[in-house]
Amino acid sequence: MKNIIYIAIMAMWLMACSHEPEAASIPFSTVTAEKEVTLTADKDAPSCKVTLNVACAKGDQPEIDKNMNQAIVQELFDMEGLSIQQAADSFATRYTQEYKKNLAPLYAQDKSDSEKRAWYEYHYTIDTHTQSGHDGAIVYLADVDYYEGGAHGIKQQIVLNFNAKTGERMTLKDVFVPGYEVRLSELLLEKLMKQANVSSIEELRAKNYLYAIDMYPSDNFILGDDEITFIYNIYEIAPYSVGKTEISLSYSDVEDLLK
């Protein structure tokens, strides 16, 4: 009889544990902001369009949501003390206002040159999504695409990793032991050379990598389930023609450096 009671109690305990919410199960909703303005009142005038789709933490623990959302506002919009909706609306308004203010005088001079019209067709887009990361972390990814004149637009990926239990942003210093920089840079360089199929730094530079900079651990990284992926956007370690560079190291590769 005692065994039956014990088994029943254990079964109830296991069922209760299985219904506890997972750390990385914080729900998100999408905040949107859109704004478009034309440079002049002319029918065929160039325009600037801002489209922002930003994931916002909407869990049942306000302090965790606040920590995450404040970090998102700071990183994506360089603002403080605003909700994500307020920051997105403010950014869209300010961006389009500055577009008209700064470019209207220039366009007045170039208006007669049809070949230059495309230079004034601006856009700024942010799309975001989240995914579960290593050891219950929440990985927040923002894809930014903008054009502000010139030969081509710019695409960037911005990553934030959050401790799901606190909502605090996780940095490299939270992941690695003090003094990690030198060895981690060496591992990243080795992996980059392998990806580029070269055996020397000279060959790597011949492929336009690290032409005027030494290898370094990017603070733009993804704490994946099985590996850490370091993101280097265009112009950070290579020119536009090379594009975004991703370097992934397994946790076993950096085992001695992990906290």
Whereabouts are the PLM-identified features?
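Sec-dependent signal peptide recognition
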Residues: K2-A8
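Exposed boundary/loop context
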Residues: I9-M10, E236
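A ubiquitous, low-specificity "background" feature that marks scattered single residues
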Residues: A8-I9, R169
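Compositionally biased intrinsically disordered regions enriched in Thr/Gly
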Residues: S18-K259
